[in-house]
Amino acid sequence: MTNLRKTHPLMKIINDAFIDLPAPSNISAWWNFGSLLGVCLVIQILTGLFLAMHYTSDTLTAFSSVAHICRDVNYGWLIRNLHANGASMFFMCLFLHVGRGIYYGSYLFKETWNIGVILLLTVMATAFVGYVLPWGQMSFWGATVITNLLSAIPYIGTTLVEWIWGGFSVDKATLTRFFAFHFILPFIVTAMVIVHLLFLHETGSNNPSGLNPDADKIPFHPYYTIKDALGLLLMILMLLLLAMFSPDPLGDPDNFSPANPLNTPPHIKPEWYSLFAYAILRSIPNKLGGVLALLASILVLLVIPLLHTANQRSMMFRPISQTLFWLLVADLIMLTWIGGQPVEQPFIIIGQVASILYFLIIIALMPLAGLLENYMLKWES
């Protein structure tokens, strides 16, 4: 009798995706982040669901309802801390996952990569609308500043902003619709994740060497299920340590004060995971130019596959490209730091140089390094 998991229509899909999936025998811990992201998404949806049971999306009671969750709901403090810090873990895993894709040339699976970039944008949008919900000072002013950027769009900008706000300022209508968006977007993300996996399983996984792994494949279970379980254990340990012992450092102190439209905080800034894009936005003194640069900072990932010039897929054996990659990582850390600083010298010029370098490395230096490495390895053909 054939095993049920190989014949049952539903079990067969799960079997082909997570059990009998042929996987390269040499993929390293950098390939763990896909499963970690899946778990992060499940944690966020579950904790979010329990928070939504007690949260009220009204300007008068939103802040109080979050305080009520932390004080009066059984383990409400833990659910809230897991949700807030879970978002940070989600983005840490996301950035490492994208970085892995760039380093090992996974972006040459174009469909998988493109849906991944759209996923990144959608998750950032979800995090933004979620950050508005506690209705603290930084929630309110963050929402005001970021939505106001759309007014830079010629002709329709102002109308568009007021349409998103549901009035002439960020108010009750804005909070209600942002709560609706924040509830629905994770399910859209889940659907996109399934498409992402669908495209990945069409080609199979890449591997550190960048060579065709078809000659040497092993079943996903038990080899990579146990490997993923170790990564999962470490991530959940980190998340629990954050949520239970140190839940606040990744947030903003201003968000402990209720939203006040009459009092602007001295430094308006988003959460840490958006700071690099915010720094690029601020480095351009023109409003529309800044908005376009902000979009380009993420969308530039879409052109990476088109700019691949090297005859080797992975950077594993390409030291010049490796150097540029780590320069890009350092540059992104620099941009993240600058995004949290006030708009004054020397931070302005540092941000502008770092922004130019970010685009220069991706669009010009990496493709040139690929050509140079081809020449040095006598791979012109």
UniProtKB/Swiss-Prot annotation:
Record InterPro entries: Cyt_b/b6_C (IPR005798), Cyt_b/b6_C_sf (IPR036150), Cyt_b/b6_N (IPR005797), Cytb/b6-like_sf (IPR027387), Cytochrome_b (IPR030689), Cytochrome_b_C_euk/bac (IPR048260), Cytochrome_b_N_euk/bac (IPR048259), Di-haem_cyt_TM (IPR016174)
Keyword Transcription recorded: no
A molecular-function term among this protein's GO annotations: metal ion binding
Subcellular localization, as worded in the UniProt entry: Mitochondrion inner membrane
GO cellular component: mitochondrial inner membrane; respiratory chain complex III
Binding site for heme b b562: H83, H182
Gene3D superfamilies cross-referenced by the UniProt entry: Cytochrome Bc1 Complex, Chain C
Binding positions (a ubiquinone): H201
Family annotation (Pfam families): Cytochrom_B_C (PF00032), Cytochrome_B (PF00033)
Signal peptide: none
PROSITE patterns in the cross-refs: CYTB_CTER (PS51003), CYTB_NTER (PS51002)
Keywords for this protein: Electron transport, Heme, Iron, Membrane, Metal-binding, Mitochondrion, Mitochondrion inner membrane, Respiratory chain, Transmembrane, Transmembrane helix, Transport, Ubiquinone
A biological process term (GO) from this entry: mitochondrial electron transport, ubiquinol to cytochrome c
Binding site for heme b b566: H97, H196
Required cofactor names: heme b
Recorded topology in the membrane: Multi-pass membrane protein
Cofactor binding mode and count: Binds 2 heme b groups non-covalently.
Listed transmembrane segments: 33-53, 77-98, 113-133, 178-198, 226-246, 288-308, 320-340, 347-367
Main location class: mitochondrion
The UniProt record lists the keyword Transport: yes
Described purpose of this protein according to its UniProt entry: Component of the ubiquinol-cytochrome c reductase complex (complex III or cytochrome b-c1 complex) that is part of the mitochondrial respiratory chain. The b-c1 complex mediates electron transfer from ubiquinol to cytochrome c. Contributes to the generation of a proton gradient across the mitochondrial membrane that is then used for ATP synthesis.
Family affiliation: Belongs to the cytochrome b family.
Subunit-level organization: The cytochrome bc1 complex contains 11 subunits: 3 respiratory subunits (MT-CYB, CYC1 and UQCRFS1), 2 core proteins (UQCRC1 and UQCRC2) and 6 low-molecular weight proteins (UQCRH/QCR6, UQCRB/QCR7, UQCRQ/QCR8, UQCR10/QCR9, UQCR11/QCR10 and a cleavage product of UQCRFS1). This cytochrome bc1 complex then forms a dimer.
Miscellaneous notes: Heme 1 (or BL or b562) is low-potential and absorbs at about 562 nm, and heme 2 (or BH or b566) is high-potential and absorbs at about 566 nm.
The protein's name: Cytochrome b
